[in-house]
Amino acid sequence: MLTISLGCNAAVQPDRTRIVFNANDKATSLRIENQSDKLPYLAYSWIENEKGEKSDALLVALPPIQRLEPKATSQVRVVKQASTTQLPGDRETLFFYNMREIPPAPDKSSDHAILQVAIQSRIKLFWRPAALRKKAGEKVELQLQVSQQGNQLTLKNPTAYYLTIAYLGRNEKGVLPGFKTVMVAPFSTVNTNTGSYSGSQFYLGYMDDYGALRMTTLNCSGQCRLQAVEAK
């Protein structure tokens, strides 16, 4: 089985790259689409906790399995359970929504060997407590605290939200060699390496609630400072 994070090579794809589940809601929905114009597929959905353990004790994906005809669309609802009241109320909790596409069985009358690959899409699902309410246009990601020592950046997240840093480069033309996306949990700290680049000027990009990449400039001449880059 092949697991991918965005479903880019899958016949059946979700309509987003992340889900924010507000605790005041009973459920949240996403749309899935069978992009094949020839074959029907089954779509098998489930939820995993932060450790990657399958569980429906807190959140349930419904229906767990459904059939999509060629070029058809459908919905998956993620429904909260009563036990979600046990989740922390002062910070987000991370889950994963998983969807595995199941192709139709090959034609047994064919003389040709057929390799079937079950592709699995996996996207982040953030449970957001009722006490956490972002104001319109609020950019909590700019509260990220950064310090530099040589070719290492320390990223400290003082907020109650998960911060996903998906871009780090000298400019907007490409990431630093070897850089991989970093997710900083609420009230935690992680380190990332800048490789052979030891300068103090960076472009740093984070993912917003809708999965869009938002760019900032990072100036570490003295104390590191983040500043949003206005969209062109």
What are the residue ranges of the model-derived segments?
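Solvent-exposed coil/turn segments that connect beta secondary-structure elements
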Residues: 35, 48-50, 73, 79-83, ...
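Intrinsically disordered, low-complexity Pro/Gly/Ser/Thr-rich segments with frequent PxxP/GP/PP motifs
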Residues: 52-85, 174-201
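Buried hydrophobic-core signal for structured, non-transmembrane domains
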Residues: 28-34, 78, 95-100, 152-157
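Short acidic, flexible loop segments centered on an aromatic residue
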Residues: 36-53, 158-175
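N-terminal signal peptide c-region/cleavage motif recognized by signal peptidases
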Residues: 5-7
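A mid-sequence, solvent-exposed acidic-amphipathic segment
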Residues: 136-172
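Terminal connector regions
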Residues: 83-132, 136, 199-232
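Beta-sheet-dominated interaction scaffolds and their linkers
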Residues: 10-33, 134-148
